[in-house]
Curated annotation (Swiss-Prot):
InterPro entries: GDSL (IPR001087), SGNH_hydro_sf (IPR036514), SGNH_plant_lipase-like (IPR035669). The keyword Cell division does not apply. Pfam families: Lipase_GDSL (PF00657). It comes from Arabidopsis thaliana. This is GDSL esterase/lipase At1g28590. The active site is at 43 (nucleophile), 346, 349. Glycans are attached at residues 139, 323.
């Protein structure tokens, strides 16, 4: 009779227990089994792609001071005073900061590659134009980013087997993406009901991208929802009203804009639940950007921010220090002495201090669903179970063929 130790089930139990022990010993290294980061999205994750794609005679605002002042001490193409959420995730995983793919010469993409472009939309610009929504910053939509990734695989990883191994062992950041689809519409004062009509199209596009990457071998995805945009200085300026009923009496946000974000996030989570059922062997983590940021506006002093968290650090004019025609990075636009005291950096994007707290809420707190550490553990288990991986690959192929 075979010993209990020879049984696959017991070996798996022993492995899980040993992994849990190692994880509990050092929480800072709990996710180091990921080999790289692959990122798609917009300005929330752009580490320099829009800058790399731009004409030297027509550079984006992120190419000019004070962007980058806090951590890098010079502009890097990031729309913040310092690091972004993707940067803090990379540091947590023990990786170098993820380099931008576009326009980046001699970059080392072994530990990560970033296709996120500031101004990018989930939907094609032509789709938005047909609905009277003008997107003029970039045409590098989510599908274009995904196509760039697919076409670059021979240079990133070489052989098909090496590429599949890279994708399987990567943490794939799917966004934030989709926010600009709504921003461009709302900045044009489109009725919110009309903006809501975009939601199923945006979600279907994100879902399709995840499915395509799953079929390429993707096993772990971090998919963010939208921020509570009712706290954005840009929207508070654009939609300023004397009707006090539209504002939250405690925080001063525009309630209807936050309601829209909640509506979108709920629909996105329902779609992710469907994908989890279709691909039970894949870790699809919802990143709750909404609540991770919301707490900073609700209790600013608790997190080290000044008691007026709504105005932008960098900007000019009005109650919220924001003006669409004189934005951060423009000549003569002032900026605060200490960005770490602000949540809002330029009226649209957050400060490094805010992004740090959001990242900690995802990596160590309750704002990743399921919790981030368990997703890492699942990835480690799958890496150790070669036989089961072959079975899952067969199931995956069947699932992809049904799509």
């Amino acid at each position: 009779m075979a010993s209990l130790d020879s049984l696959p089930a017991m070996k798996l139990v022993r492995f899980i227990l040993s992994t849990l022990l190692v994880t509990s010993v050092n929480s800072q290294t709990q996710c180091r089994n990921f080999k790289s980061i692959i990122s798609f999205g917009d300005s929330i994750a752009d580490t320099g792609n829009l800058l790399g794609l731009s004409d030297p005679n027509d550079l984006p605002a992120s190419a000019f001071p004070p962007y980058g002042e806090t951590f890098f001490h010079h502009p890097t193409g990031r729309y913040s005073d310092g690091r972004l959420i993707i940067d803090f995730i990379a540091e947590f995983l023990g990786f170098p900061l993820v380099p931008p793919f576009y326009g980046c010469q001699n970059a080392n993409f072994k530990k990560g590659v970033n296709f996120a472009v500031a101004g990018a939309t989930a939907l094609e610009p032509s789709f938005l134009e047909e609905r009277g929504i003008h997107s003029t910053i970039t045409n590098v939509s989510l599908s274009v980013q995904l196509r760039s990734f697919t076409e670059s695989l021979p240079n990133l990883c070489g052989s098909p087997s090496d590429c599949r191994d890279m994708i399987e062992n990567a943490l794939i950041l799917m966004g934030e993406i989709g926010g600009n689809d709504y921003n461009f519409a709302l900045f044009q004062r489109k009725p919110v009901k009309e903006v809501e009509e975009l939601v199923p199209f945006v979600i279907a596009t994100i879902s399709s991208a995840i499915t395509e990457l799953v079929c390429m071998g993707g096993r772990t995805f971090l998919v963010p929802g939208n921020f509570p945009i009712g706290y954005s200085a840009s929207y508070l300026t654009l939609y300023k009203t004397s009707n006090k009923e539209e504002y939250d009496p405690l925080t001063g946000c525009l309630k209807w804009l936050n309601d829209f974000s909640e509506y979108y996030n709920k629909q996105l989570q329902e779609e992710l639940n469907g994908l989890r059922k279709l691909y039970p062997h894949v870790n699809i983590i919802y990143a709750d950007y909404y609540n991770a940021l919301l707490r900073l506006f609700q209790e600013p002093a608790k997190f080290g921010f000044m008691n007026r968290p709504l105005p932008a650090c960098c900007g000019v004019g009005g109650s919220y220090n924001f003006n669409f025609s004189r934005r951060c990075g423009s000549v003569g636009v002032e900026y605060c002495d200490d960005p770490s005291q602000y949540v809002n950096y330029d009226g649209i994007h957050m400060t490094e201090a805010a992004y740090r707290l959001i990242s900690e809420g995802l990596l160590k707190g309750p704002y990743a669903i399921p919790p981030f550490k368990w997703s890492c553990l699942s990835s480690e288990i799958m890496n150790k179970m070669s036989l089961d991986t072959q079975i899952l690959d067969e199931q995956l192929l069947q699932g992809c063929l049904k799509v």
